[in-house]
């Protein structure tokens, strides 16, 4: 089955339906991607192929095909001996990914200026107007999705399939890194709280990007996109520092809990 790259298949926008509309491998991939990008499986966690195949009522071979696709997108790692795991990224790798994302901003901006159609621009304006309307009421989970779609619409308007793919791979990899940190800092992944936080923090960057799009100035568009990328990396670095503090604190507590009041190891 050939995909239409202009249709969103991120897997974070809505939970896959129970019925199979596409191929079985697409169906399996959608379910896996949804769970990885929404914190059901976090970095380092093993994906139980047999259990998943039984749950979705499809073969393990189909699950394996889906995991191979996700491995190509940098979401999972396949070990021939140990199985399939959600990919774990180091902070250094995330910084490298962010550097690539920054470099793509200039190409996105130049392609947008030369290739965006009136329909593309109208779609961006419509989404931004809906985002502005959302500011006047209480936050809803769908608002986060709309924010993603707005940013995606700008990249889509560059009308470059490979650029679109690279943009989303970088976004997805950053997301699973942050969800992993959140799990280890808070002990659980509250995806709705995470999405709400991301939506609120992104408001100023969306407004700056929209103003740049209206101006049609290539440098302004690139700068607005880089500012957003830089902010995302900064938040990842801050969350990583929180993760280090939390894990070190937990380790110290474990050491203390195994010692008697005299300071000797318990049972010694």
State where each predicted segment sits.
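Residue-level recognition of short, well-ordered coil/turn positions
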Residues: 40, 75, 139, 217-218
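Short linear motifs at protein or domain termini
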Residues: 1-114, 119-120, 237-250, 254-268
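Conserved amphipathic alpha-helical segments that form helical-bundle/coiled-coil interaction surfaces
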Residues: 118-185, 202-212, 218-231
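C-terminal all-alpha effector/ligand-binding and dimerization domain
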Residues: 2-9, 20, 180-268
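Residue-level signal for well-ordered alpha-helical positions
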Residues: 89, 169-170, 177, 235, ...
């Amino acid at each position: 089955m050939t995909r239409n790259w202009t249709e969103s298949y991120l897997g974070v926008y809505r939970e896959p339906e129970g019925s199979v509309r596409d191929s079985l491998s697409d169906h399996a991939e959608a379910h896996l991607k949804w769970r990885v990008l929404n914190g059901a499986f976090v970095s380092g966690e093993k994906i139980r192929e047999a259990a998943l195949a039984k749950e979705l009522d499809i073969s393990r071979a189909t699950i394996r095909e889906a995991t191979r696709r996700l491995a190509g997108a940098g979401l999972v790692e396949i070990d021939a001996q140990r199985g399939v795991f959600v990919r774990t990224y180091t902070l250094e790798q995330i910084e490298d990914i962010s550097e690539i994302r920054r470099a793509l901003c200039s190409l996105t901006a130049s392609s947008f200026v030369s290739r965006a159609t009136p329909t593309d621009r109208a779609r961006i304006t419509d989404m931004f107007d809906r985002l502005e309307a959302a500011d006047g009421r209480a936050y809803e989970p769908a608002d986060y999705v709309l924010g993603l779609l707005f940013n995606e619409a700008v990249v889509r308007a560059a009308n470059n399939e490979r650029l679109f793919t690279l943009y989303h791979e970088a976004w997805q990899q950053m997301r699973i890194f942050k969800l992993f940190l959140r799990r280890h800092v808070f002990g659980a992944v509250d995806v709705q709280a995470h999405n709400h936080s991301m939506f609120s923090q992104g408001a100023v960057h969306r407004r700056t990007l929209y103003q740049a799009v209206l101006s049609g100035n290539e440098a302004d568009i690139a700068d607005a996109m880089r500012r957003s990328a830089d902010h995302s990396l900064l938040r990842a670095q801050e969350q990583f520092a929180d993760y280090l503090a939390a894990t070190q604190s937990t380790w110290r507590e474990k050491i203390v809990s195994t010692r008697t009041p005299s300071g000797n190891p318990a049972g010694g």
